[in-house]
């Protein structure tokens, strides 16, 4: 019976994976998706260029034009071939409210036109001041960092409407040489060699400019264009089918499908707990394993495309932590069969993957060449994943801590469950401390080879150490009897704030230190602070309930006798 239920869950997961995901499955621009472009230090398909460009400028791969949703390829081709007035389109994402207020823009408006931003003199002053500080190696304010991010979006948009910036013409002989735009190919090749290619490009451009009715005839033209580019330099141009894997990865959306499976497993596990006769535990396990398998496949595809471990920026660390939460929870769940590991892990893994999928302007999903300090694949492959897995362990402990505190708050009489949750939490905290300790030591060794010192009190290093100490204190306190089961639950929730600071705060709030390759902008400090504040109120409520402070207060008030008035 267990095997049958497990198989049912796994089959449901496979069915979900097999369903078409994208709403843009039959675009007439599909033949152009595998057109090879040299950009950002590597060769990538035009489909990837389109998705990255639109996501970076607009904050989403879907753009709504005249109440019609356009996919990234349609929007990018319109930009590239400039078939409408993009100067006036409210296309550029600008969401940082304080900077909008400072430069006189509507703080409630999210998207602005290229023209509106380029002609804003106050914005220009902030950008110039930011560049001056960069030259003098001074720290930038949040406004200045956001202004530079916005400048990058405007620069990218300006470059996207220029034929020469989309490098599709290969170098004649050097596999690492610089490619050219279609209008610059005469600098590399003779007119006779490029004439057929220019003709194919002109036909393609005319088809697109003539309207959507002509796009279905694009297939042979796209084939001629790709064949012509390959014929120019067959030893340099990637082989036929070289871009297929990356295009498949873009459209398969493995991480989105993984969070759907995690979410479904969570719902099934809830039914198992709430509806006792309906024992679907192994079906939930099957769905959860399906999610882990799909996410693992997504990591493998990304590694094949990038040629390195997928843990080099904030986007990759978020999806890796989500994977770590799921994998660690699954391991413990298969050992203890307690249900609570999966119940705590699934929402956290879903949250990580949804955040990574829905915030491309903040968590950049593009695959880029590594900065020099990260090019040692050995240290990159062991230090960063180890640190991220420790964060995953602590996040899982955070989830179990919430389940435990919820029990203290609403069902304090369930003593056996509270004891079990404390034991489960303690095991995860031990794993997290072990991994974080190992990660800090490995990072110190890597720093010694890269920067010539083992420890330099860099903000990232300092906050990692603070996080470790925040977890070591309650673990040792439990050993010597200073804190009990409730204290472990509180510590697993409260101490995660140190992890949040080491992981998010150093990158998006402080933005200083030698770990600059992990920095970013666009994170909402107030939103994070609000979530943390509400979470601490939850901890306080559970503490008040557990300690019985309100009961004692009411009891003391009821025992007081009314005083007598003396004349």
Roles of regions detected by a PLM:
Residues 2-26:
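Hydrophobic secretory-pathway targeting helix
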Residues 19-248:
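Soluble extramembrane regions of membrane proteins in the secretory/endomembrane system
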Residues 261-266, 319-333, 385-404, 464-478, ...:
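Hydrophobic cores of alpha-helical transmembrane segments in multi-pass inner/ER membrane proteins
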Residues 490, 521-522, 531-567:
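Long, compositionally biased intrinsically disordered regions
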């Amino acid at each position: 019976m267990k095997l049958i239920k497990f198989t049912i869950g796994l089959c449901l997961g496979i069915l979900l994976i097999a369903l078409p995901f994208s709403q843009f499955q039959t675009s007439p621009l599909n033949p152009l998706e595998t057109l090879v472009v040299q950009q950002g230090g590597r060769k990538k398909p035009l489909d990837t260029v389109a998705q990255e460009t639109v996501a970076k400028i607009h904050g989403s791969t879907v753009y709504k034009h005249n109440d019609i949703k356009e996919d990234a390829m349609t929007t990018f081709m319109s930009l590239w071939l400039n078939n409408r007035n993009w100067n006036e389109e409210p296309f550029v994402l600008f969401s940082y409210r304080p900077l909008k207020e400072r430069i006189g823009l509507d703080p409630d408006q999210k998207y602005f036109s290229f023209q509106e931003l380029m002609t804003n003199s106050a914005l220009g002053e902030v950008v110039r001041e930011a560049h001056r500080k960069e030259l003098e190696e001074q720290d930038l304010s949040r406004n200045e960092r956001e202004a530079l991010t916005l400048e990058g979006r405007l620069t990218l948009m300006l470059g996207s409407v220029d034929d020469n910036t989309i490098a599709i013409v290969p170098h004649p002989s050097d596999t690492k040489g610089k490619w050219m735009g279609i209008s610059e190919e005469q600098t590399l090749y003779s007119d006779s060699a490029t004439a057929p290619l220019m003709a194919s490009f002109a036909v393609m451009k005319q088809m697109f400019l003539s309207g959507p009715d002509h796009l279905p005839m694009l297939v042979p033209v796209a084939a001629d264009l790709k064949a012509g580019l390959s014929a120019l330099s067959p030893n340099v141009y990637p082989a036929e089918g070289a871009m297929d894997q990356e295009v498949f990865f873009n459209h398969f959306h493995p991480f989105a499908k993984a969070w759907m499976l995690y979410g479904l497993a969570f719902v099934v596990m809830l039914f198992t707990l709430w509806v006792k006769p309906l024992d679907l535990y192994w079906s939930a396990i099957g769905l959860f394993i399906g999610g882990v398998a799909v996410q693992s496949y997504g990591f493998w595809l990304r590694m094949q495309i990038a040629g390195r471990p997928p843990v080099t920026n904030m986007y990759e660390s978020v999806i890796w932590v989500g994977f770590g939460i799921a994998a660690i929870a699954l391991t413990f769940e298969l050992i203890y069969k307690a249900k609570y590991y999966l119940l705590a892990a699934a929402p956290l893994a879903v949250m990580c993957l949804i955040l990574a999928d829905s915030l491309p302007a903040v968590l950049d999903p593009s695959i880029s060449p590594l900065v020099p300090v990260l090019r040692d694949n050995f240290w990159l492959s062991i230090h960063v994943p180890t640190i991220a897995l420790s964060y995953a362990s602590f996040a899982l402990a955070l989830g179990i801590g919430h389940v435990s505190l919820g029990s203290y708050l609403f069902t304090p009489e369930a003593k056996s469950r509270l004891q079990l949750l404390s034991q489960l939490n303690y095991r995860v905290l031990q794993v997290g401390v072990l991994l974080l300790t190992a990660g800090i030591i490995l990072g110190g060794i890597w720093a010694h080879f890269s920067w010539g010192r083992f420890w330099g009190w860099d903000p990232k290093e300092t906050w990692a150490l603070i996080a470790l100490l925040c977890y070591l204190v309650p673990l040792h306190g439990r050993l010597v009897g200073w804190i009990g089961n409730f204290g472990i639950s509180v510590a697993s929730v409260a101490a995660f704030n140190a992890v949040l600071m080491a992981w998010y705060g150093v990158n998006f709030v402080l933005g200083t230190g030698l770990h600059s390759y992990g920095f970013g902008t666009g994170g909402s400090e107030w939103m994070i602070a609000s979530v943390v504040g509400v979470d601490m109120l939850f901890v306080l409520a559970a503490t008040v309930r557990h300690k019985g402070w309100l009961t004692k207060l009411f009891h003391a008030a009821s025992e007081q006798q009314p005083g007598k008035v003396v004349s």
